[in-house]
Amino acid sequence: MEKQYLTFISFCFSITICGFLIVSWLARSIIRNGIRTLTWRKETKRKKKNQEDENKMSLLDLPDLTLDCILEKLSPSELCAMTSVCSELRDKCVSDHLWEKHMETKWGRLMGDAAIQEWKSHVATIMRCLTSSSSSSRKSKPNWSSRFVANLKPFAWLSSNHGCENRGSSSYLAPIDSVMYWYSNLENGKFWFPAQVYNRENGHVGFMMSCYDAKIRYDFKTDTFQARYSAHGRRAAEEKVTWQRLRPSQDDTKSRDLHVSDCLHGLRPGDHFEIQWRRTKEFPYGWWFGIVGHLQNCDGVQNCRCDSDENVVMEFRQFRPESPWRRTVIKRKDHRETGNEENGFYGGVKKLGTEEEISTWKQLWPSQALE
């Protein structure tokens, strides 16, 4: 009896061991097949992805002409954003031919010869500093020039004006003598440049219908300008000067130089002109708008001979008829500065030849006559 019991126990144990081995074998087979299936699927996906990647075209794979056409359509902020994509695109996006269009569109009207010369002088000064510091840095450890360039952040205007914040400043660094760097310095107000301001000091009555030289810089937050006027004594300043009140500085005549009047013999009644005027000889000239009038003995209708007279009447019709500032008379021949300490000094004259110049002045006309 006892022998039969031991035989039964041995048989059950053998069956259990066999069952366990069978289950283990099945489990290993399932796991092995599962891993093999997963590996196959992953490999298939990888091959498919590689195939798709091979079929995709990169922007840099485009012909140069096509890529340039695309980049030319981008705004300044978009061009700046593209510089952070890769070095190849950065080199393309900082090229002058892409930025010249943006410069001309926004800043061309104000970039006269004087402003351009000012920028060239500014760049030359920076380049001299960099060259000098580069040579001196070879003798000492600190590389001042590299720190200087690294701290040039000309695209600060992007963060608040164009939504390009959180981009590394190094990706925006452009060559100092590039149009992109020039544009960026104008945009962020780093560069003061010469221009002329109509109706200075917020349209102060003493400057209505005049235009004065100033140094200006842009404020991108308000889309207006700050202006500093050069004068005898205190230096006047003004904020929130609009685009409409600005024109490029005239490089041919400095604010303290007498303009050569080569138009006097051709002036006729009704012609529009600008004339230099200053309060005293210590002050710089401003340009004042006027209209050629008739002589006192002419009725302005019949037998008018004002155009052949040796004198020419300069009228400033923004003033009341009884105002001492209403008119002055100058000689056509050998005209020099004329005037006195009471009424100021009149300088050179230039005739306005385009309708655009005349309409600009008329838009600034005061709402009521001045005293």
UniProtKB/Swiss-Prot annotation:
Domain of life where this protein originates:
Eukaryota
Q: Which Pfam families does the record cross-reference, listed alphabetically?
A: F-box (PF00646)
* SMART domains in UniProt: FBOX
Q: What is the lineage of its organism?
A: Eukaryota, Viridiplantae, Streptophyta, Embryophyta, Tracheophyta
Name assigned to this protein: F-box protein At2g41170
All copies of domain F-box, residue ranges: 56-102
